[in-house]
Amino acid sequence: MFRDKYCAEVKEEEIGKEISLCGWVFRRRDHGGLIFIDLRDRTGIIQVVFSPEISIEMHQKAHGLRSEYVIAVKGILKKRPEGTENPELITGNVELWAKELEILSFSKPLPFQLDEMAEVSELLRLKYRYLDLRRAEMQKNFLLRHRITMAVRNFLDSKGFVEVETPMLTKSTPEGARDFLVPSRLNPGTFYALPQSPQLFKQILMMSGFDRYFQIVRCFRDEDLRADRQPEFTQIDFEMSFVKPEDIIEIVEEMLFKCFKEVLEVDIEIPFKRLTYEEAINKYGSDKPDLRFALEIQDVSELVKNSQFKVFLDTIEKGGVVKAICGKGLASLSRSEIDKLTALAQSFGAKGLAWIKVKNGFESPIVKFFSESLLREIAEKVGVEDGDMILFVADKKSLANEVLGRLRLEIAERAQIKKEGFYFAWVLDFPLFEWDEEEKRFVSMHHPFTSPKDEDIDKLLKIPQEAFYDPQSSVKDIKAKAYDIVLNGYELGGGSIRIHKADIQEHIFRILAISEEEIKRRFGFFVEALRYGAPPHGGIALGLDRLVMVMTGANSLRDVIAFPKTQKAFCPLSEAPSEVNLKQLRELHIKLDI
């Protein structure tokens, strides 16, 4: 063994003892006679002192040490002289006086200093990820990720779940994001797909009698990236037989409660708040509302009917709505700043943005169209105070909700009104389908294997084929046995009770405009499995990366994934994806056409 213990495990009780340690040179300071080294490993830092009085040879050797050299040292632990203690270090009251030093490996000059990260670009950090990961902040993130994963595994094991691995090379059944395809050398012209989720296999495991399955599983989606998305990601995935939504909701709440308690020593409040999909959209303009602040969207259509403002009246007459939100603290905005806010709303799809400042009364070009009493009624409904601004969007209900929902987040960011803590919610009663204007057909709000609510099944089976292509048909009214879990404005996970009868599953496929031939080709194996005695079952998948991101307070998923991709799905460290040689392509019977 190179060492007796980790750096931060050294205790004051060991003063006077000989100790061997290993790690990286974090800092080196030459104070004339003495050389001080901050020795770092994954647990922390300890100060090592080289003195010519102890060993001239080791002292001279220490002169050559540079940042990130890997060394082994042996020495006597001493108490630091009074006044030189470092309260920021666990080991700040002691130091190791070295009598032996071995340089295990050298380091080139660093592209950036590990303790000065503010000015370092993310691209450079990702290129030298092995250096970036040495930083205490990153080490902390991944140790916490490990503890979260272990807490989840232990909890699910205690509840009778069985961990089963599902295939990484599977069939392409695209319904949503693009698949990552893998060509088959042994079956020329055919392709595997990397799984977007283990959906079909975990359902088949329920049909196989496993009753309770879980997996910490890698998933892959070829989609445009943003701060909370990666092409490969990890899910906490589980499925249960003979359950109702309430059973799964209770398991998830208990699991997360124990996870936060064990890992962060935080008591989250359970049961979580519950919202219907309609309520979430109407109040917050999003099906993943951030509940760290209030600012609910209000429908003021009935009130503004009593105004003389033609823009509002015309919108209502055409079947639209007028909705408003409190612009917290925005009454101080200049006209040019309001114009920028209007441009932002327009970038979200709004035709414009009406506003009224609440500042010792009401100020706006449009106040002349409202009576004083009406303005007070609107202000009361929207919940504004002196110093705030009322922001209005007049349009179709869906667009007004979306625009104000996005402005709501912008306002909260500007006003710095997000509360500290973890704010969970369940979103329930989703529509089973939504209309895709581009494809002119209904698509699944979640996925095609989500069960309709019991009271909607007969209605669903009686929907005639011509209604499948009518956005106003009764298809839009069918509700799903689905439940999404939201944390601080992030969709943490989604689940549902699944369809366990072949006839209902086939009917869903038809509503989704999937032909009989396509059903057989893409999902035939799955529909066949449903004909051999499938139990009622349901499950959920939670995004482990997102959970860790929120629990650590990280700004991006890239700070909690060891080797992430950029927003162009590129790995600066390995330079993947990369070209392959012609021999490999020929073996796969692939010819490029770029």
Swiss-Prot record:
Span list, region Aspartate: 199-202
A GO cellular component entry from the record: cytoplasm
PROSITE patterns per record: AA_TRNA_LIGASE_II
Xref: Gene3D superfamilies: Bira Bifunctional Protein, Domain 2, GAD-like domain, Nucleic acid-binding proteins
Keyword Nucleotide-binding: yes
Listed Pfam families: GAD, tRNA-synt_2, tRNA_anti-codon
Reaction(s) the record says it catalyses: tRNA(Asx) + L-aspartate + ATP = L-aspartyl-tRNA(Asx) + AMP + diphosphate
Primary localization class, coarse: cytoplasm
Binding site for ATP: R221, D222, E223, Q230, E491, G543, L544, D545, R546
Highest rank taxon of the organism: Bacteria
Site feature location: Important for tRNA non-discrimination: H31, G83
A single BP term in Gene Ontology: aspartyl-tRNA aminoacylation
Single GO molecular function: aspartate-tRNA ligase activity
Keywords of the record: Aminoacyl-tRNA synthetase, ATP-binding, Cytoplasm, Ligase, Nucleotide-binding, Protein biosynthesis
Binding site for L-aspartate: E175, R221, H446, R498
Localization (cell): Cytoplasm
Enzyme Commission identifier(s): 6.1.1.23
Protein family (similarity comment): Belongs to the class-II aminoacyl-tRNA synthetase family. Type 1 subfamily.
Oligomeric and partner information: Homodimer.
Function, in words: Aspartyl-tRNA synthetase with relaxed tRNA specificity since it is able to aspartylate not only its cognate tRNA(Asp) but also tRNA(Asn). Reaction proceeds in two steps: L-aspartate is first activated by ATP to form Asp-AMP and then transferred to the acceptor end of tRNA(Asp/Asn).
Record protein name field: Aspartate--tRNA(Asp/Asn) ligase
Organism: Thermodesulfovibrio yellowstonii (strain ATCC 51303 / DSM 11347 / YP87)
